[in-house]
Curated annotation (Swiss-Prot):
Subcellular location(s) of the protein: Endoplasmic reticulum membrane
One Pfam family from the record: Glyco_transf_22
Transmembrane helix in keyword set: yes
Transmembrane segments: 22-42, 83-103, 106-126, 132-152, 168-188, 216-236, 252-272, 280-300, 309-329, 342-362, 369-389, 411-431
First-listed, main subcellular location of the protein, grouped into a coarse class: endoplasmic reticulum
Pathways per UniProt: Glycolipid biosynthesis; glycosylphosphatidylinositol-anchor biosynthesis
Signal peptide start and end residues: none
Protein's recorded name: GPI mannosyltransferase 3
E.C. code: 2.4.1.-
Membrane topology annotation: Multi-pass membrane protein
């Protein structure tokens, strides 16, 4: 390597060091805007597997949080909700001193989890770029295309600032990949004087950071072990890789020692957190496998064909970059310029194949489960994207390092247009009603019960009003169709929603399991008998709500129900719409089709005016 090349490389690395902090700031600002613009509902786990247990942890068991069966049976690690519980407490402490009493405090508590998640998402994008820099070079056009693919990816825009455990898992995974010693996939460097390979590990602290972050990702989502098992397997065996291995016995011993220490540290932290949260020693990973595999409860939430990830999952997370991602998986090393780069790219490609292949064997599948692979896919697809959309002019004496020129502009603008359309539609127009209806109910509660609102704020949202037994809202819709206490906020805002707990009391492949119908199923199977004989039966002791919330398709059932003797004996003689929310152009679940409506039952005072539909 010439001195000019070395000098140029040093300048590029110095420039990258200077730009790192500025890029991180700008990326986080983009993700904060991203979080602010997300005004739609996607999946229940965004709230019920993170924010609800976090709310319960921050404000106590009387705060009204909804803990699903997974938390009652310790299937989830407490580390994820503990992160948001901390930000809840900090936000409540600061806002209580700035705004001792005021409805703006509720707005702050709704917003702070998304703000924290935006920072986490920004870190994921930034580390994706830095991992690409470590692979392709500090001044490589390809590195910036990896960042470009992350920033303009509609799936990333739609999901990265949502409080899914998969979103945090994605960031932890790419952070761990960045700190991983990829030089172990390089080639042994020997000399005639010393035929033994030189020490290859550059920094033990980077290795420890990688192992701790990887262990944390595995504790958070046990299936993340597939990614790291693949990387370690190829590092040790070098299957289909080039060049002699730089691994020595001492390096292998160091890897094993550090893996044991770092893994034990994270397991100890996780165990202590779970002991504190649940009140006794438990191992959520075992419980997760026991309930979902041994008792086959995962299939209760849906079955998908074996090819789901190949034909739906990868296209959804890649969208317009899919052709480049497919090409890179077919020939991951086509643009490699060194042996180490060849081996790293091949390992990343095999990581995608192994993870997708293994997860395809599991009956219950969701796109979110392969979300941690997105940074690797962006990095693999970046060379193909860069070569398609840019050309490199030949250097001249006056311009020895010419900037790449954009080409195929028509395709570029079409791809960007499609991405922006998808991101915009999903962010604003696809299922906004579940969030809007809770804001409406919260504001109505603030209007009708100002004393209870003041009590909630002075008690830091941890105390129920003593003499308030009003059922404020009844949700007659598929279970978990809206967020819960993270958006309702006030403990005194009592609400009831149809449940859908799996049949924990049954065994797989039994008539009891096959014929099981949860509460939401029973409502949609036969709505009027369900309402008269089950939901409002004397044994249920459910009071008549102030509001009923549901999708527009249930209105004929409600009108029929209020004509029954059972409803009229409860004082429920009419329902009238007072709020209506647009919920998108389509929905894959027929039960959620159409607008969402709030009906007033007329049994309480201070009712709002009728909403014209």
């Amino acid at each position: 390597m010439s001195s000019a090349t070395v000098s140029r490389k040093s300048l590029d690395e110095a420039r990258n060091q200077r730009n790192r902090s500025f890029f991180l700031r700008d990326i986080i600002v983009i993700r904060l805007i991203n979080a602010w613009w997300i005004a739609t509902f996607f999946q229940p786990d965004e709230f019920f597997q993170s924010l609800e247990p976090a709310w319960n942890l921050a404000f106590g068991s009387q705060s009204g949080a909804w803990l699903t069966w997974e938390w009652q049976h310790q299937l989830r690690t407490s580390l994820h909700p503990a992160l948001f519980a901390g930000v809840y407490l900090v936000a409540d402490f600061i806002s209580s001193h700035i705004l001792p009493v005021g409805i703006l405090r509720a707005t702050i508590l709704v917003a702070v989890p998304q703000a924290l998640q935006a920072v986490i998402a920004g870190l994921g994008d930034w580390y994706t770029w830095q991992l690409a820099v470590s692979i392709y070079g500090a001044n490589s056009n390809v590195s910036f295309f990896a960042l470009f693919l992350q920033i303009f990816n509609p799936w990333q825009w739609y999901c990265s600032t949502r409080t899914f455990s998969n979103s945090l898992e994605m960031t932890l995974t790419v952070m761990a990949m960045y700190y991983w010693p990829w030089e172990l996939l390089g080639v042994a460097q020997t000399t005639k004087e010393n035929p033994k390979p030189a020490p290859i590990l550059k920094s033990l602290w980077s290795l420890r950071a990688s192992l701790c972050l990887a262990a944390l990702a595995v504790v958070l989502r046990p299936t993340n072990i597939l990614i790291w098992a693949t990387i370690v397997l190829f590092t040790i065996t070098r299957i289909s890789l080039q060049g002699p291995s730089p691994l020595t016995l001492s390096t292998v011993v160091t890897l094993i020692r550090e893996a044991i220490w770092c893994g034990s540290l994270i397991l100890a932290i996780s165990a202590a957190s779970d002991r504190w949260y649940f009140g006794f020693w438990t191992f959520p990973a075992y419980n997760f496998l026991y309930f979902n595999l041994s008792k086959s409860l995962a299939v209760f939430y849906g079955r998908s064909p074996w090819h789901y990830y190949f034909l739906q999952g990868l296209p959804l997370i890649c969208t317009t970059s899919l052709p480049f991602a497919v090409a890179s998986l077919y020939k991951p090393t086509a643009h490699a310029t060194s042996t180490q780069q060849f081996n790293v790219l091949k390992t990343l490609a095999y990581t995608v194949f192994t993870t997708v292949g293994a997860l395809s064997l599991i009956t219950h599948k969701e796109v979110r489960f392969i979300y941690p692979l997105l940074p690797a896919l962006s990095i693999l697809a970046a060379p193909y994207t860069a070569s398609f959309f840019t050309s490199q002019p030949s250097p001249t004496t006056n311009n020895p390092r010419p900037q790449p020129q954009i080409r195929n502009k028509r395709y570029l603008f079409v791809a960007l247009g499609v991405n922006m359309f998808l991101a915009g539609y999903l962010s604003f127009f696809h299922q906004p009603a579940p969030l809007n209806v809770l804001a409406y109910l919260r504001h109505e509660y603030e209007r009708i019960h100002p004393d209870s609102v003041q009590l909630a704020q002075t008690s830091h949202f941890s105390a129920m009003p003593e003499n308030e037994d009003e059922l404020f809202a009844l949700f007659l819709m598929p279970c978990h169709s809206t967020p819960w206490r993270s958006h309702l906020i006030y403990p005194g805002l009592r609400a009831y929603a149809l449940g859908c707990e799996p049949p924990l009391h049954t065994e797989p492949n039994t008539p009891e399991r096959d014929n099981y119908r949860d509460e939401a199923d029973r409502f949609y199977d036969d709505p009027i008998p369900f309402l008269t004989s089950e939901l409002f039966s004397p044994t249920k002791a459910l009071t008549v709500p102030r509001y009923i919330v549901g999708f527009e398709s249930i209105e004929p059932w409600l009108q029929e129900f209020v004509q029954t003797f059972e409803a009229q004996s409860l004082g429920l003689t009419q329902v009238r719409p007072v709020w209506k929310g647009f919920n998108g152009l389509f929905n894959e679940d027929w039960r959620r089709s159409g607008d969402m409506i709030v009906w007033d039952t007329g049994v309480y005072d201070n009712a709002p005016p009728t909403k014209e539909l």
